[in-house]
From Swiss-Prot:
Name of the protein in its database record: UDP-N-acetylmuramate--L-alanine ligase
Lineage: Bacteria, Pseudomonadati, Pseudomonadota, Betaproteobacteria, Burkholderiales
Pathway: Cell wall biogenesis; peptidoglycan biosynthesis
Similarity comment: Belongs to the MurCDEF family.
Encoding gene (name): murC
Function: Cell wall formation.
Annotated source species: Variovorax paradoxus (strain S110)
GO cellular component assignments: cytoplasm
Alphabetized Pfam families for the sequence: Mur_ligase, Mur_ligase_C, Mur_ligase_M
Amino acid sequence: MKHAIRHIHFVGIGGSGMSGIAEVLFNLGYRITGSDLADSATLRRLAGLGIGTFVGHAAAHIDGADAVVTSTAVQSDNPEVLAAREKRIPVVPRALMLAELMRLKQGIAIAGTHGKTTTTSLVASVLDAAGLDPTFVIGGRLNSAGANAQLGSGDYIVVEADESDASFLNLLPVMAVVTNIDADHMETYGHDFAKLKKAFVDFLHRMPFYGVAILCTDDPAVRDIVAEVTCPVTSYGFGEEAQVRAIDVRAVGGQMHFTAQRRNGVTLPDLPIVLNLPGEHNVRNALSVIAVAVELGIPDEAVQRGLAGFKGVGRRFQSYGEVAAQGEPAGSFTVIDDYGHHPVEMAATIAAARGAFPGRRLVLAFQPHRYTRTRDCFEDFVKVIGNADAVLLGEVYAAGEPPIVAADGRTLARALRVAGKVEPVFVDDIGAMPQAILDNARAGDVVLCMGAGSIGAVPGKVVEIAAAASLPQQTTRTRRKGEAS
């Protein structure tokens, strides 16, 4: 980046993608400021690093900035954007700034409708275990680093490639993973699935001639594009044709054990793997990491250590531990938090929970995300949500969208009742969800909180309320009228 750029301001700095880029640039020596609509733990953490943060948007916040970075959530009439344009300060989309960062290193980009954050985190963890000290920008908090971004001294940068707004077409990686291609964010592609698949092909063709595409051929849509990809391809999955393949897959508590067969280029010895994550979908994510490791020549021992020692990502099957159950019988229930909000993600996570906690009643607390997704995936939501043993259903988190008739939480709850597999409890106000969980969960249950909206605050609140309820009652009380002292 030209050294005339010294001060970079972020509009919407509290977002997971924006905060990560801001932190890396700050650690590169740039002066960073940023604003967001509401205060958050992310804003407070960035302020603790020395980044100037503002709650709310105002033209004065961009004073002195040489460039202004925006996310797709920021509207064109935002006062900071308008002020920047009036002053002829460059307004840079988030993806272009990420692409600029990637020019500094060898870029590994993780794309796909589902699994990007977990896979990016696993790649970063294995590179770190190999002593390669990667830079990474992730859409979730990597627990081992305590952050969603890190500036490393090594040659590689690992990032998520976002297809939701087609911004991944701005990136120029040297290696790219595609985990899957599913019908989500279809408004970006004119509700044309063929256009979505073509965008992934175009993304892969952004790589240089020496680039490598690592593709999950278990996914039908990914299989469809393989013939169109002109760069070298390494396939992975459970199928016999996959060059990096998992066999002998089994769940052991909250972990997955399997053997990786590697036949990309030369046949390598089978590699026994312990993955510190549940679910077959995460085995596939790990296979892509193993394929990356083969391409980079990472020793097997580092791969095994990075996957077995993986400490997880915030809001990706994140355990909040045991919470005391109310009522009888006495005991506790387990609380798990997950960001999944698409039916495919939810089905995989529910299956992972069944595997990790066999024989236990599964209570799903779900907040749908976006009216358009609820409308477009309505029947799939009914099928998937019905796989839980009990359901607490919140109202749709709008994410800025106007309501759509018959695509709201109450209508979804009625459809679940008609389907007859489960009797949902509709919780209109997400603020009431923690108490609803405590009222409905029994000893021995697993409570799985899912959604991409404000439900992320619910698991912590459940723990907080339960802990307060278990405190010893105060020994002093106000005397009733007439009571002897």
